[in-house]
Curated annotation (Swiss-Prot):
Official protein name in the record: L-asparaginase
NCBIfam families, sorted: asnASE_I
Organism field: Dirofilaria immitis
Repeat keyword on record: yes
Enzyme class: hydrolase
Active-site residue numbers: T16 (o-isoaspartyl threonine intermediate)
A single GO molecular function term of this UniProt record: asparaginase activity
Annotated keywords: ANK repeat, Hydrolase, Repeat
């Protein structure tokens, strides 16, 4: 019996991870990695693929069964031509990757990008900004040693990235390396010889791959927008880096600030300081700001952030140079490129966006939780709990129930109060349902909209393989369906089950539920396990009103079922001449 599957798309752009050892050096070779993985048992269960995908036009790969997971991770790989050394990566390559993800976004639960390590952090930062309203995991990884070597971090990195992309609700661009998952726009390469090549200096990893996989769900950045996923494929090329150093020549500074430069990342000493006696440099910076150039002040230090409470840092701030908080140089540069390319924003808006935390790229002061939830302390006293570990387990047990209770009642104020007290709105209950499932099932439009603005996932499937959109369909709530669809939600159930649902509606003559399925994006000609469509059932039931309803919505009278019968043939056999006449006038659906 075929297992439940999680489908992942892998984009192989190049890099050490897929190289071959030739004449004493590692070299990229077209199609080498694709063929090599096919024979690596840790990366591909060939028996499973041969059993269930023998007739597939493009055969996928499949990870061996994972401990504590019922899903099989099935993945397809696209190899770029030519394979790119990461040192050759350009803005156009970032756009290429983004567009590839956009084209395949609805077909996969997550994405993995195989990339060379040298500019991997730049690509991760760029994609984090270009990919707007992301609600699926996009994991970038690479290697210090190729996948096919006996000693290889590439093999473990690829497996870990696939597991994250297939199984975890981490809807942002991340970097996976050496058993740690980092936010993409917080990552820097720190070592070219160690397996610990990457670090996130100002933020703890989102997840650790130890004996157990530990995810810090509170640190995940979730899109606050209700808009659907889109790729912003324009980037401003007129940006640069200006690193301050002692006795720097004014000509060097002037050259870095001249038009057509529109944005500069100024890398200063310590907490954002530069020589206070260098009025010539300050004058050049002021001229650039006055002509509309956006300058971001970032520290040359690996850790820490810009502090405008020092005199020289305050001077820069007062002249209009924007403090970059704890952004990395890679994040600041790619964010500048992204923000400057937004022609719909005025200069003031662009500057405001550079200060704002738009993808989790910088640290902003967080309000402390208003108070500890009284129910937690009361239950802890009742159960005689005292240790922090016991309290944590208690919170994990009751928070999902509190969230689902609030969602089922449409209690937005309670949802807000829970969120303000540090509760992760994306947690799931014992049925694998999140608050969005529950709010949609109860028909609470306001609660659904609030949860969407807090980044709660509508892609998440419960133990019945249903997402929030399916819950809304069952409620027959048109407004809810439109709300979720406009945010990018798609039906989660498989095609055969969808066919059964449509045929069941037809057997009852239930046009209201049919309307809901169609509004949610269902194909009116979807077939059930016998190959029958809703139109087959309607004709066989002699329900002429329903037949006309379905034909008005492009149902195909020529669709052949497993018994080689069409709705038209059924109508002829039942002598329903008026239906036969109408069906013959219709064209066959391609």
């Amino acid at each position: 019996m075929q297992c439940e599957e999680a489908h992942v798309l892998v984009l192989y752009t190049g890099g050490t991870i897929g190289m071959k050892y030739i004449d004493g050096v590692y070299q990229p070779e077209a199609n080498y990695l694709l063929h090599a993985i096919r024979d690596l048992s840790l990366l591909n269960d060939d028996d499973y693929v041969s059993t269930y995908y023998s007739d597939a036009e493009i055969r996928p790969y499949c990870l061996p069964p994972l401990q504590h997971s019922k899903k099989r991770v099935v993945y397809w790989m696209i190899e770029y031509d030519p394979l790119l050394d990461s040192s050759d990566m350009t803005f156009d390559d970032w756009i290429h990757i983004g567009k590839d993800i956009q084209r395949a976004y609805d077909q996969y639960v997550g994405f993995v990008i195989l990339h060379g390590t040298d500019t991997l952090a730049y690509t991760a930062c760029a994609l984090s900004f270009m990919l707007e309203n992301v609600r699926k995991p996009i994991v970038i990884t690479g290697a210090q040693i190729p996948v096919c070597e006996v000693r290889s971090d590439g093999r473990e990195n690829l497996i870990g990235a696939l597991i994250i992309a297939a199984n975890y609700d981490i809807p942002e661009v991340t970097v996976y390396f050496n058993n740690k998952l980092f936010r993409g726009n917080r990552t820097v390469k720190i070592d070219n010889r160690s397996m610990d090549a990457f670090e996130s200096p100002n933020m703890l990893p989102i997840a650790y791959m130890d004996v157990d996989i530990k995810v810090n769900y509170d640190s995940i950045f979730r899109s606050p927008s209700m808009a659907p996923f889109v790729v912003h494929d324009q980037l401003c090329r007129n940006v640069g880096l200006l690193r301050i150093f002692p006795s720097m020549s004014i000509e060097n500074v002037r050259a870095s600030l001249q038009a057509p430069i529109e944005g500069v990342v100024l890398q200063t000493f310590g907490a954002g300081n530069m020589p206070s006696h260098r009025t010539d440099i300050i004058d050049e910076l002021k001229k650039a700001v006055d002509r509309g150039c956006i300058i971001i002040n970032c520290s040359q230090c690996v850790r820490g952030q810009v502090d405008i409470h020092y005199l020289t840092g305050k001077v820069l701030y007062d002249m209009g140079i924007i403090p970059g908080s704890d952004m990395t140089a890679e994040a600041a540069l790619t964010k500048l490129s992204y923000v400057l390319s937004k022609d719909c924003w005025e200069l003031v808006e662009k500057k405001a966006m550079m200060v704002k935390n738009i993808r989790g790229e910088l640290t902003v002061a967080k309000a402390e939780p208003l108070k500890d939830l009284e129910i937690v302390s009361q239950m802890a006293r009742f159960l005689h709990l005292s240790s922090s570990h016991e309290m944590k387990l208690l919170c994990h047990a009751i928070f999902p129930q509190l969230l689902c209770y609030a969602a089922s009642n449409g209690d937005i104020e309670m949802l807000k109060a829970l969120h303000e007290n540090g509760v992760d709105l994306s947690v799931v209950d014992y049925n694998g349902r999140n608050a969005l499932h529950v709010a949609a099932s109860a028909g609470h439009v306001g609660a659904v909209k609030y949860l969407l603005t807090q980044g709660v996932s509508f892609h998440l499937r419960d133990q019945w393989d249903e997402n929030a959109l399916v819950s809304a369909v069952k409620m027959k709530n048109k407004i809810l369906i439109e709300t979720l669809r406009s945010a990018g939600a798609l039906l989660s159930i498989n095609s055969r089950r969808l066919g059964v649902e449509l045929c069941l509606c037809a057997s009852y003559g239930d046009t209201e539920t049919l309307n809901s399925w169609l509004a949610a994006g269902a194909d009116i000609n979807q077939q059930d396990y016998n190959g029958e469509t809703a139109l087959h059932i309607a004709v066989k039931s002699r329900n002429k009103q329903l037949v006309h309803y379905l034909l008005d919505r492009d149902a195909d009278p020529y669709k052949i079922d497993d018994f080689n019968l069409t709705p038209l043939r059924h109508a002829k056999k039942l002598n329903l001449q008026d239906l036969v006449i109408r069906m013959k006038k219709m064209k066959k659906v391609q």
